[in-house]
Design a protein with these regions (language model features):
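Short, exposed beta-strand "edge-strand" segments with a Pro/Gly-rich flavor and a Y/T-containing core
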Residues: 16-20, 102-109
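Intrinsically disordered, low-complexity segments enriched in small/polar residues
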Residues: 1-3, 11, 31, 60, ...
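The catalytic-center signature of Zn2+-dependent metalloproteases
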Residues: 34-107
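Solvent-exposed, flexible loop/coil residues
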Residues: 8-11, 23, 58, 69, ...
Length: 129
């Protein structure tokens, strides 16, 4: 496992309120393909209220962010043009920090994900030290 974090509605203000990452996922670490530090970005995304891009697969409300394209399963590489939910709009978000793509592939959050993190911060983390 490269890292983990609790969602803010489950742990904010408790001893479980933290982000944990494997040192090998940090720059210079031994987790080949996953050692540029993007695991930390991914886990902070969870800590700020984001689900995986593949949450719920091709059905339902997915990651609860409307501008994140649906994805049936995680991407462990960087397959451009991948579309595991052809009946849903958009290609798989392989460049999104909340997928499992290689660190070299992860470059973005959607605008909706940023709004969700802002909302979660205001609700669960604002004013905490």
């Amino acid at each position: 496992m490269l890292g983990w974090a609790r969602f803010p509605w489950r742990a904010a203000g408790t001893e479980l309120d933290h982000v944990s990452v494997n040192v090998d996922s940090m720059p210079g670490g031994r987790a080949a393909g996953y050692n540029a530090g993007d695991t930390l970005v991914h886990e902070v995304g969870h800590w700020m209220g984001l689900f995986h891009t593949f949450q719920g697969g091709c059905e339902g409300s997915g990651d609860l962010v409307v501008d994140t394209a649906a994805e049936a399963e995680p991407e462990f590489d960087c397959t451009e043009g991948r579309d595991t939910c052809p009946d849903q709009p958009g290609l798989d978000p392989v460049h999104n920090f909340m997928d499992y793509s290689l660190d070299s592939c992860m470059t973005e959050f959607t605008a909706g994900q940023v709004r969700r993190m802002d909302t979660a911060f205001a609700q669960y983390r604002s004013g905490r030290s």
